[in-house]
Amino acid sequence: MHTVDEISECPKTLLLTGASRGIGHATVKRFSAAGWRVITISRQPFSEKCPWAHGKENHLQMDLADPGQIEQGLRELKRRLPESKLHALVNNAGISPKMPDGSRMDTIHTDLKIWWHVFSVNLFSTIALARGLFEELSAAGGTIINVTSIAGKRVHPFAGPAYATSKAALGALTRELANEFAPLGIRVNAVSPGEVATSILSPGTEALVESSVPMKRLGTIGEVAEVIFFLCSEAASYVTGAEIPIDGGQQVR
């Protein structure tokens, strides 16, 4: 049985950053299956490995670390929005730099240029998109979803301080935007994934799950996508300012 959002006056429009793999990939598939039109943004050209309809013509190639490219991309995006309405913005793109051996980068060994790049992609691009699209979101009674991380709330063995602090800041930004944008009819929430099964898992993940996750398993990208879809649906019409953990109870340990 389909939900109200799946059988109403579709297509609604979703803009999602970071769609080529993992959580973003699963989220596009979930919304596409519900009849939404999905516009994707990434630094790379559209990948033919992305199996959703009209994906190539609904893709914008943009470096989210470059304010000039964001400004230019916003102009192009606005031309593509029917009736100047955007129903959902999902800020999923994120980078987590590692040392050459794959270990986490600590504060001392992370050059300030890397910090700036991480914050540009993980935080500042979110601000730029929210500022640039609030009118289109307001016109649709839309919603913003920010993808944070459990690393934004606790020291994580695989995520370094640049990534962790950018995600903590994104959680704070979610609350600020929820407060500012509520009078505009825009809801703003976040999802905070824990250990999620992806194509590349850090060594030691299984041991971390066993010791730190009460449910004793990895989450799936589909489970994260379902929560994102819920937050963009009428079922969550009175939910704003929330940061929902999707971590099998990891945050309680």
Predicted features along the sequence, with ranges:
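Active-site helix of classical SDR
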Residues: 130, 166, 174
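Short C-terminal tail/terminal secondary-structure segment
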Residues: 2-5, 154, 207, 229, ...
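Alpha-helical segment proximal to the catalytic Tyr-Lys
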Residues: 135, 179-180, 237
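Substrate-binding pocket helix/loop in short-chain dehydrogenase/reductase
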Residues: 99-116, 209
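Short, small/polar-rich loop/turn modules that mediate ligand/substrate recognition or access, typified
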Residues: 182, 187, 239-241
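Residue(s) in the substrate-gating loop at a strand-loop-helix junction
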Residues: 149
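Conserved glycine-rich cofactor-binding loop
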Residues: 20-21
